[in-house]
Amino acid sequence: MSHRKYEAPRHGSLGFLPRKRAAKQRGRVKSFPKDVKSKPVALTAFLGYKAGMTTIVRDLDRPGSKMHKREVVEAATVVDTPPMVVVGVVGYVETPRGLRSLTTVWAEHLSEEVRRRFYKNWYKSKKKAFTKYSGKYATDAKQVETELARIKKYASVVRVLAHTQIKKTPLSQKKAHLAEIQINGGSVSDKVDWAKEHFEKEVSVDSVFEQDEMIDVIAVTKGHGFEGVTHRWGTKKLPRKTHRGLRKVACIGAWHPANVNWTVARAGQNGYHHRTSINHKVYRVGKGTDEANGATEFDRTKKTINPMGGFVRYGNVNNDFVLLKGSIPGVKKRVVTLRKSLYVDTSRRAVEKVNLKWIDTASRFGKGRFQTPAEKHAFMGTLKKDLEN
């Protein structure tokens, strides 16, 4: 091109400003799906931990497409989702200025891993969180019932307080993640009764999501620190002979007014942003107790979802898990929030039935020639390291 272009679309979206570090590492749910009272009572979100990615093979079910009934290879993400424990219920009332918290009722007993969430330094603390509140169940149980009755009478939105069981994961962290999750379906009284029945009980992920469902993933993205404008905004590099650097913006604005407009691309923080990734297809909701949760109808090999040697920088997934199409925000070990979609997606991609033919469980550390240890032993034979001294 021998002349300069006099028009070009701007680089980078202004819809995600400010590009700064997220305040909390857990993904916040700012909106929940619309409540339908005719449906049964159920949670609308769940917390999990990103374990890693794998590869799947399936037949595409898309009539009219040239790829219909043909094999496709796709990337998928494994999210470790140990059962969550319900420890409280919150009632909200509608006001002209939005929802307002009415009252909160906690369970009688809270585990140590969730009580750690209320302390900055657990070891130097007196560890007395909720000891006074728990005494109400012995001395003044009537007050707890009164608060639940208030929620039934005045509240229009009911949410439970549930925490993860991080001790069941390979992570070294001992502090559980606590979140408010909205209950949809049924009347307000049904919601409160459901929450009370599940106090101090586990809720599994298969009671929230199912296969072939489209869900949203809310998480904090991978952080990259302070980055230059070319990497951060994708601006064009300047010509080779440019004075004082190439990876810059040539003109950041007029001389007067003597300030830089907020729309101008600048260097700064890149990554570790709070993001919501929508419409991820659920390929599988697996059970941790199933020793063949990595097998399919076409691949009858008895294997789990874990690759040989475990997921790199995570370990083995021994709990229930969710297999999602594509990649999701965040790094391995990071807590992610899985939420039901805010709207009903009727596209062919959303309504098609998924039938997995093969899930890759080869080692992620090296060439990955074998799917199971038995397959490796059959090919390699007994190795010297396997012999007992």
UniProtKB/Swiss-Prot annotation:
Transmembrane segments: none
UniProt GO molecular function: RNA binding; structural constituent of ribosome
BP GO terms, sorted: maintenance of translational fidelity; ribosomal large subunit assembly; rRNA processing; translation; translational elongation
GO cellular component annotations of the record: cell surface; cytosolic large ribosomal subunit; small-subunit processome
Alphabetical list of PROSITE patterns matching this protein: RIBOSOMAL_L3
One Pfam short name: Ribosomal_L3
Localization of this protein: Cytoplasm
Family stated for the protein in its record: Belongs to the universal ribosomal protein uL3 family.
Family annotation (PANTHER family): 60S RIBOSOMAL PROTEIN L3-RELATED, LARGE RIBOSOMAL SUBUNIT PROTEIN UL3
Summary of subunit composition and partner proteins: Component of the large ribosomal subunit. Mature ribosomes consist of a small (40S) and a large (60S) subunit. The 40S subunit contains about 32 different proteins and 1 molecule of RNA (18S). The 60S subunit contains 45 different proteins and 3 molecules of RNA (25S, 5.8S and 5S).
Record-given protein name: Large ribosomal subunit protein uL3
